[in-house]
Design a protein with these regions (language model features):
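C-terminal helical subdomain
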Residues: 180, 229-279, 283-289, 293, ...
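Short acidic-hydrophobic sequence patches enriched in Asp/Glu that either
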Residues: 52, 223, 287
Length: 308
C-alpha cells in the first residue's frame, strides 16, 4: 500500500459515487465531506441537530460550489430514529461509502440513550452498528462498497476492555470512550470477515489527535480537561489533517479489507496515513463474534451479513 507521499489531491474522480458521513456538521466529518465533494462524490450529510445540519450544508455549498449534497437528520442515540433515517435509503439508494465518524467522549456522568444504553458506547459503537446494518441493502447495491469506521488511539488503552460494555458495574468517562473505540475496531474486524470473498471492504481508522467538537463534554471532567489541555499544546492537529486517514481509507485503490490505518507521524499523532498495529486481541474471531451477538441483542437489530 504505497502512500508515503499521498495527499487528498491524489483522490480519484468520485463522480457517480455516493458517500454518507455521520457527524458531518463540523470537524473531521465536515472536512471529510468537503474533500469528497471536491472530487465529485454525492454527499449525504448527516447530523443530529437540524439547525447545525442546515448550517453545515450552507457552508459546504459555499466551500464547494456545485456540490451534489443532501442532508439526513440522524440521532445515533435513538435506535428508532436510526431505522427511520436509513429506511428510505435502504429502499432504493446505492451507497458506495459509509463513513461512521460521529462520536461523543468524556461524558462526565453515566447517561443513557433513549433506548437505555450507556451513552458513549451506545452512540459511538451501537448506533453505528445499527446504522450499518440498516444501510446494508444500499451498500450491497454498490459494486465495491466501503464501510470506514473512525476509532481512536484510545482503542489500545487498558481501560478499553469490553467487559462491562454498558459500564453497569462502574463508570469512568474515558474508560467508556476507550471501550467504544475498541468496539469500533472489533466490529470492523468482524465485518471484514463477513465481507470476505466479496468486493466490499470494511476499514477502521484513527485520526491521531485533533481539536474538534468531540471534546465538548471535557470541561466537566478533570481528567478530560487535563487530557485536552496537554494534548492541544503538544499533539493535536487540525481536523484537516485528521481527516486524512478517513479519506485515504475511503478512496485509495489499494486499501485492503480489514485494514487499520492511522497517521504515520511521531506517536501516530499526525502525518500521512499508513497501516498501524491493531490493539492487542482486537482481531480475535471469538471476541468479534461475541461483540456482534451482544450488539444485536442490545440494539434488537439483526445484521443481514452472515458469519462466514
Amino acid at each position: 500500500m504505497p502512500n508515503s507521499h499521498w495527499t487528498p489531491a491524489d483522490i480519484p474522480d468520485l463522480k457517480g459515487r455516493t458517500a454518507l458521513i455521520t457527524g458531518a456538521n463540523s470537524g473531521i466529518g465536515y472536512r471529510t465531506a468537503q474533500v469528497l465533494a471536491e472530487h465529485g462524490a454525492r454527499i449525504l450529510l448527516t447530523g443530529r441537530r437540524p439547525d447545525a445540519l442546515a448550517d453545515a450544508a450552507r457552508r459546504l455549498r459555499a466551500d464547494v460550489p456545485g456540490a451534489h449534497l443532501e442532508t439526513v437528520e440522524l440521532d445515533l442515540g435513538d435506535l428508532a430514529a436510526i431505522r427511520d433515517a436509513a429506511a428510505p435509503l435502504a429502499a432504493g439508494e446505492t451507497l458506495d461509502l459509509l463513513i461512521n465518524n460521529a462520536g461523543v467522549m468524556d461524558v462526565p456522568e453515566r447517561r443513557l440513550t433513549r433506548d437505555g444504553l450507556e451513552l458513549t458506547v451506545g452512540t459511538n459503537h451501537l448506533g453505528h452498528f445499527a446504522l450499518t446494518a440498516h444501510l446494508m441493502p444500499s451498500l450491497q447495491r454498490s459494486s465495491a462498497a466501503r464501510v470506514v469506521t473512525v476509532s481512536a488511539v484510545a482503542a489500545a488503552w487498558r481501560a478499553g476492555d469490553l467487559a462491562d460494555l454498558m459500564s453497569e458495574r462502574s463508570y469512568r468517562p474515558m474508560s467508556a470512550y476507550a471501550k467504544s473505540k475498541r468496539a469500533n475496531v472489533v466490529f470492523t474486524q468482524e465485518l471484514a470477515r463477513r465481507f470476505a470473498g466479496s468486493a466490499h471492504r470494511a476499514v477502521v481508522v484513527h485520526p491521531g489527535s485533533a481539536v474538534t467538537n468531540l471534546q465538548r463534554h471535557t470541561s466537566a471532567s478533570r481528567t478530560g480537561r487535563l487530557f485536552v489541555a496537554l494534548a492541544s499544546r503538544t499533539l493535536m492537529g487540525s481536523p484537516d489533517g485528521a481527516a486524512w486517514p478517513s479519506l485515504f481509507a475511503a478512496t485509495h485503490p489499494e486499501v485492503t479489507n480489514g485494514a487499520y490505518l492511522g497517521p504515520a507521524g511521531r506517536d501516530q499523532t499526525s502525518g500521512t496515513p499508513e497501516p498501524v498495529r491493531l490493539p492487542a486481541g482486537a482481531d480475535g474471531p471469538d471476541l468479534g463474534a461475541w461483540l456482534w451477538r451482544e450488539s444485536e441483542r442490545l440494539t434488537g437489530v439483526t445484521f443481514p451479513v452472515p458469519q462466514t
